[in-house]
């Protein structure tokens, strides 16, 4: 759950979960519905006010790319409104660059730290600036911290999914894609007409899931449509084929990738021991 609280007057902590899109990748950009759920992995930001610093200082060790990204969030927050000087410390358990919503979770945790709980407007401004072209599904799932059905430009609705829907599910890391998400989004948008059928199928998968359809069958159908979009790399395709041959089902979560890795693959109905050793596996049992 998303929460912010002030322990002492000068110390504020806010947490934001990652997200997994069960159905809807890319289709949500074109008005089809999607379903996303929060993950047990999260970003926590601690803010300690200190007037003597005169600025907001980041205390976090990470890759240069992510350090710069988080500093951009802080600088945007400072430019948007009155922010007290102090130190922000970050703790993160969300896998980075893997389609699990880390970039949005950083924004939400940090804006809540700097502006307080009721900062959706400011958080959206930062998200729009740093992640242009986003559909809004990541933001809706992470801000609400609950499973949601999302349709672009509409208020997200909470969706009642079976509590054990991800019981035994695995997240398998196929590696970082060669393409960044904005590049992939642009490429899919440019082919909208030729991709009408797979986009429609992805939208239908959402409705089937809402109607308590067979989750494994829905995942298989969704994966086939994602492959038709061209955002599942050969490496990820091979892995998903192996999983299906073992009786399981799997799909890429998030933007995927044309070449290289495709980020995280969500797998259901298969034991972790059946996954080839070269792939790091995270269990979603919580």
Regions of interest found by a model, annotated:
Residues 98-119:
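DPxDG-like acidic metal-binding loop motif
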């Amino acid at each position: 759950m998303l929460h912010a609280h002030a322990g002492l007057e000068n110390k504020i902590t806010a947490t934001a979960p990652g997200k997994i899109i069960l159905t809807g990748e890319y289709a949500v950009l074109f008005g089809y519905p999607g379903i996303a759920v929060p993950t047990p992995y999260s970003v926590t930001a601690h803010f300690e006010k200190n007037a003597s610093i005169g600025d907001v200082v980041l205390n976090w060790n990470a890759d240069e790319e992510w350090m710069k990204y988080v500093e951009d969030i802080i600088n945007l927050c400072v430019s948007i409104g009155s922010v007290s000087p102090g130190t922000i410390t970050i703790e993160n358990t969300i896998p980075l660059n893997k389609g699990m919503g880390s970039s949005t979770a950083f924004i939400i945790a940090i804006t809540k730290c700097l502006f307080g709980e009721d900062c959706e407007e400011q958080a959206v401004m930062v998200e729009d600036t740093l992640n242009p072209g986003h559909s809004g599904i990541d933001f809706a799932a992470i801000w609400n911290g609950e499973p949601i059905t999302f349709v672009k430009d509409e208020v997200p609705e909470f969706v009642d999914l079976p509590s054990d829907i991800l019981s035994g599910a695995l997240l398998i890391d196929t590696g970082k894609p060669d393409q960044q998400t904005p590049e992939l989004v642009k490429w899919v948008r440019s082919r909208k007409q030729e991709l009408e059928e797979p986009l429609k199928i992805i939208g239908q998968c959402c409705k089937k899931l809402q109607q308590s359809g067979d989750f494994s069958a829905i995942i298989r159908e969704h994966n086939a449509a994602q492959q038709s979009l061209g955002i599942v790399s050969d490496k990820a395709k091979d892995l998903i084929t192996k999983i299906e041959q073992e009786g399981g089902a799997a799909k890429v979560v998030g933007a995927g990738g044309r070449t290289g890795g495709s980020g995280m693959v969500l797998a259901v109905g298969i034991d972790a021991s059946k996954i080839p050793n070269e792939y790091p596996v995270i269990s979603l049992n919580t």
